[in-house]
């Protein structure tokens, strides 16, 4: 039995789930009666994890956003991980939504501080886009997992490499 246990906290997104949510949103877009006759499009840039929404009506653009977010929720992706990058108007209204797939330094510090303030017998360290948490007891690690899930973060938090 190991004397120390550890796991990594990351914000990695499952690219396949992101693509599945995109496909489901496109399918719903084609079948929605309230969107018939209105030019609406949903595209996904897989490299940057950006949903590109466009519509001839600004009101329908918000409907498209709701469709995409509802599909992401159904696929297990935290809606807080989605940020609105830009909203453009003209002949077509456009909206870009980015799915965050990395822990930035601000959120990493916030998570690290919450772990330190919890007074649990664990050590945490920031390692690039991940946070490594080490403890002697697995129960302490599980308490940290619960603590991190309860934090209000704009990330899709996941736990990996529990050893």
Curated annotation (Swiss-Prot):
One of its GO terms (cellular component) is cytosol. InterPro entries: DUF520 (IPR007551), UPF0234-like_C (IPR035571), UPF0234_N (IPR035570), YajQ-like_sf (IPR036183). It comes from Campylobacter jejuni subsp. jejuni serotype O:23/36 (strain 81-176). This is Nucleotide-binding protein CJJ81176_0398. Coiled coil: none annotated. Belongs to the YajQ family. Gene3D superfamilies: 3.30.70.860, YajQ-like, domain 2 (3.30.70.990). Signal peptide: none annotated. Nucleotide-binding protein.
């Amino acid at each position: 039995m190991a004397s120390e246990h550890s796991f990594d906290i990351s914000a990695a997104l499952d690219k396949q789930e992101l693509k599945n949510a995109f496909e489901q949103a496109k399918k719903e877009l084609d079948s929605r009666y309230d969107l018939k006759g209105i030019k609406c499009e949903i595209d996904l840039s897989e490299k940057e994890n950006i949903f590109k929404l466009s519509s001839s009506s600004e009101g329908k653009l918000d409907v498209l956003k709701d469709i995409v977010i509802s599909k992401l929720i159904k696929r297990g992706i935290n809606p807080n991980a989605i940020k609105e990058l830009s909203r453009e108007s003209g002949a077509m209204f456009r909206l870009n939504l980015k799915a965050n797939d990395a822990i930035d330094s601000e959120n990493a510090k916030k998570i690290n501080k919450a772990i330190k303030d919890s007074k649990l017998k664990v050590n945490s360290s920031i390692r690039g886009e991940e946070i490594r948490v080490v403890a002697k007891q697995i129960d302490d690690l599980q308490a940290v997992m619960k603590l991190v899930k309860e934090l209000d973060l704009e990330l899709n938090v996941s736990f990996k490499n529990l050893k």
